[in-house]
């Protein structure tokens, strides 16, 4: 009787997984890519950096080399203690398109990136804003063109893909990129069905009026992180949000090099998610619950060999469906190599996520440098 109930439970969570992977994530994975027409609208590219001198030297020139007729580059130095501000000042002297915003430590907003970004957004002279981070670089000289091509009169928020550079012979790098792929497949899929809920600040564009319509970051200013996902969670609607996933629109940054650094980064991300709207917390929680439950139920039923052929069939079919859904997404996002490890990476992430939840119950994660 107990095992029969467990089998029904396995079937139920497998069904939930099919709904996610086919009906939601599949809206992105299996959809034909949409291409927008170049708009050539004036754009303010905004980069907020804190102690990123080494990256600034390499990546700001790549931003200035963009094939785009009218844009300014707003460089925000968030009270850096290294050479970041000096480098920004040099770029401002050398190129009239560069505008420097200097942010000094403010007791009311100590170490708060949202305060720095707010000053940068107010300083931007153009209505259309394109964001990336100080440690990111565009995948092509057409990054601005591609991201802005998705703007229309109605679509005033564009979610882009912030990828991580590949590192040969690094298992951790593959795990991080797999997680990034899974996360992107989720928020692109939900955006495609009219339920946008998050984005990444490494690659995000929106019209300035969207920022002021929700009073900027004021409603969550005390939450140290979330300048990207909490803002989108509040401002994005089915009508005003779209995505951009052409390869030329990607940005890249270097992934964490140690498990500890990556784990702490995940702690920050998950601590922000608890401030999402109730429905978004439910949709994310249900997906994770179905992942964990499916794995545990399958292990128990197979270990006791209860209706093992039926159980094995459900497990195999579930992994095939998930593999196809994520595999097509991986093809679009140029992450195919991580799919060879899919079942192992998924199981590892499920238990890492559980570890993060438990750790966050007992201590608060560190935030902006």
Predicted regions and their residues:
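Short, well-formed alpha-helical segments that are part of the catalytic scaffolds
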Residues: 24-33, 52-65
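N-terminal membrane-anchoring/stem segments of glycan-assembly enzymes
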Residues: 1-38, 326
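Short aromatic/hydrophobic "clamp" motif used to bind/position activated sugar donors
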Residues: 117, 129
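Cell-envelope/extracellular polymer assembly enzymes that use nucleotide-activated donors
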Residues: 41-44, 72
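Catalytic donor/gating beta->alpha subdomain of glycosyltransferases that bind UDP-sugars
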Residues: 151, 157-183, 209-212, 216-281
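Acidic donor-binding segment of Leloir-type glycosyltransferases
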Residues: 60-107
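Acidic donor-binding/catalytic loop of UDP-sugar-dependent glycosyltransferases
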Residues: 83, 133-149
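Membrane-embedded multi-pass helical conduit in multi-pass membrane proteins
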Residues: 287-364
């Amino acid at each position: 009787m107990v095992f029969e109930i467990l089998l029904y439970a396995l079937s139920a969570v497998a069904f939930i997984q099919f709904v996610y992977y086919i009906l939601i994530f599949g809206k992105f994975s299996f959809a034909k890519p949409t291409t927008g027409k170049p708009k050539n609208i004036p754009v303010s590219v905004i980069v907020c950096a804190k102690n990123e001198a080494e990256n600034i030297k390499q990546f700001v020139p790549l931003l200035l080399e963009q094939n785009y007729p009218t844009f300014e580059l707003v460089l925000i130095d968030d009270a850096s203690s290294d050479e970041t501000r000096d480098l920004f000042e040099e770029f401002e002297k050398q190129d009239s398109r560069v505008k420097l915003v200097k942010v000094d430590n403010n007791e009311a907003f100590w170490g708060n990136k949202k305060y720095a970004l707010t000053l940068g957004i107010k300083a931007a002279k153009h209505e259309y804003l394109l964001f990336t981070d100080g440690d990111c670089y565009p995948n092509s000289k057409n990054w601005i063109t591609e991201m802005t091509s998705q703007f229309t009169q109605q679509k005033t928020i564009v979610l882009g893909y912030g990828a991580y550079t590949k590192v040969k012979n690094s298992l951790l790098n593959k795990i991080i990129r797999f997680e990034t792929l899974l996360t992107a497949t989720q928020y692109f899929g939900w955006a495609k069905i009219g339920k946008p809920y998050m984005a990444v600040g490494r690659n995000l564009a929106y019209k300035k009026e969207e920022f002021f319509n929700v009073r900027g970051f004021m409603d969550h200013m005390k939450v140290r992180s979330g300048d990207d996902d909490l803002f989108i969670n509040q401002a994005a609607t089915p009508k005003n949000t779209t995505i951009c996933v052409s390869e030329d629109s990607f940005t890249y940054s270097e992934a964490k090099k140690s498990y500890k650094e990556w784990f702490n980064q995940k702690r920050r991300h998950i601590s922000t998610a608890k401030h999402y709207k109730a429905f978004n917390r439910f949709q994310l929680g249900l997906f994770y619950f179905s992942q964990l439950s499916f794995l545990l139920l399958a292990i128990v039923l197979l270990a006791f060999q209860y209706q093992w052929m039926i159980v094995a069939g459900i497990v195999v079919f579930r992994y095939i469906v998930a593999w196809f859904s994520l595999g097509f997404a991986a093809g679009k996002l140029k992450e195919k190599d991580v799919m060879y490890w899919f079942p192992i990476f998924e199981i590892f992430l499920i238990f890492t996520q559980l570890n993060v939840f438990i750790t966050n119950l007992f201590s608060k994660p560190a935030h902006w440098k």
